């Protein structure tokens, strides 16, 4: 039905918002407006990484990261290395956490890690890594492509600032759907600018979420399928 003030457009907008509410409740995020719909988990991760590292800084990643993490980091790092790699020790969370701790420098801005490897199935101790991030006043970004809908995820208890989710895996949604759930500790800049169905008289991208990170016609059928 498209967007707009007509009956079908408003009904579609309400359905999209219901999906935000469902996702926020499921992943323990207080504000449904901070649920951003994306094409996939890869897009969500690009939005988080390129926003956090837009000007400077480094991140700590695990040695099990997907290319959705590593390729954006390589694009961001010509001539200036911007990540340190922590070795995961399967079956020994203490060693894994200490490996991340050793990689933290005064220039580190975030810990970025997968919840579980798509190759080996190794699960990382994200709650402890989230605690480590808070201990050092770092952001915590989690790639939950493999685990959302399969393993428990609690953005508040796990201290997650940005949760990147695929819709078509454990959430049983359509392909071509994903989400970036955003906490309050860091404001990502706009990623793609354009129409949002709001504040149309302004040339500037709206500052509030989700409009700051959602431009163009949304995938309303896919989003509704994700909620279903």
Give the predicted meaning of each segment.
Residues 1-228:
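Pyridoxal 5′-phosphate
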